[in-house]
């Protein structure tokens, strides 16, 4: 437990309504001299933000997370199936949590995840992945538009700009944060 006055941006709290990430915190003085802590909270697994007021000094339950390494296995309906490398249990992550990160997933990719009571709250891909080029533009098709680069479709369906010398079948390193070509492997 933490006091409401100790809440800070980035903390996770657990309430009777669910799990939340603290997005903003401000101290508000009431008309009768009492102080409240006004907090904007983002609901777990969604983009919904709600505002809550806590009395100054009120105890709030801080959510405890376990960092886990998960290996991607395959997509099953609307969930991505992962293997927890710590205890070898299967963990399902809904598409809503994966969002744009899903475009980099291929079997065997290991991600870092924060787990609370068996549920994945957030995840992070490795910063760099090596992916095979499955299709490219002809060098002349896109050179004039992109300053010497051409479009390449990778094995996971991601499209990136690559130098003209990259060909189908090449394995390239991609920055998953910016979706940019780094080098040919």
From Swiss-Prot:
Pathway of action: Protein biosynthesis; polypeptide chain elongation
Gene Ontology cellular-component annotations: cytoplasm
GO process terms (BP): peptide biosynthetic process
GO molecular function, one term: translation elongation factor activity
InterPro entries found in the cross-reference section: Elong-fact-P_C, NA-bd_OB-fold, Rib_uL2_dom2, Transl_elong_fac_P/YeiP, Transl_elong_KOW-like, Transl_elong_P/YeiP_cen, Transl_elong_P/YeiP_CS, Transl_elongation_fac_P
Pfam families hit by this protein: EFP, EFP_N, Elong-fact-P_C
Primary location group: cytoplasm
PROSITE patterns attached to this UniProt entry: EFP
Keyword Glycoprotein listed: no
Keyword annotations of the record: Cytoplasm, Elongation factor, Protein biosynthesis
UniProt-annotated location(s): Cytoplasm
Function: Involved in peptide bond synthesis. Stimulates efficient translation and peptide-bond synthesis on native or reconstituted 70S ribosomes in vitro. Probably functions indirectly by altering the affinity of the ribosome for aminoacyl-tRNA, thus increasing their reactivity as acceptors for peptidyl transferase.
Family according to the record: Belongs to the elongation factor P family.
NCBIfam families: PRK12426.1 (NF009090)
Name assigned to this protein: Elongation factor P 1
Gene encoding the protein: efp1
């Amino acid at each position: 437990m933490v006091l409401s006055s100790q809440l800070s941006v980035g903390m996770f709290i657990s309430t009777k309504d669910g799990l939340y990430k603290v997005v903003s915190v401000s101290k508000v003085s009431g008309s009768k001299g009492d102080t409240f802590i006004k907090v904007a909270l983002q609901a777990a697994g969604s983009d919904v933000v709600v505002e809550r007021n806590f009395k100054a000094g009120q105890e709030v339950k801080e959510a405890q997370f376990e960092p886990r390494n998960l290996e991607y296995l395959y997509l099953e309906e609307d969930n991505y199936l992962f293997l927890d490398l710590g205890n070898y249990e299967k963990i399902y992550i809904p598409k809503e949590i994966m969002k744009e990160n899903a475009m980099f997933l291929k079997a065997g990719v290991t991600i870092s995840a924060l787990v609370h009571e068996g549920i994945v709250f957030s995840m992070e891909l490795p910063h760099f992945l090596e992916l095979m080029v499955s299709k490219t533009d002809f060098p002349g098709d896109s050179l004039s538009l992109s300053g010497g680069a051409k479009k390449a479709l990778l094995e996971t369906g991601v499209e990136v700009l690559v130098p003209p010398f990259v060909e189908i079948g090449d394995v390239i390193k991609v920055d998953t944060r910016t979706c940019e070509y780094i080098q040919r492997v």
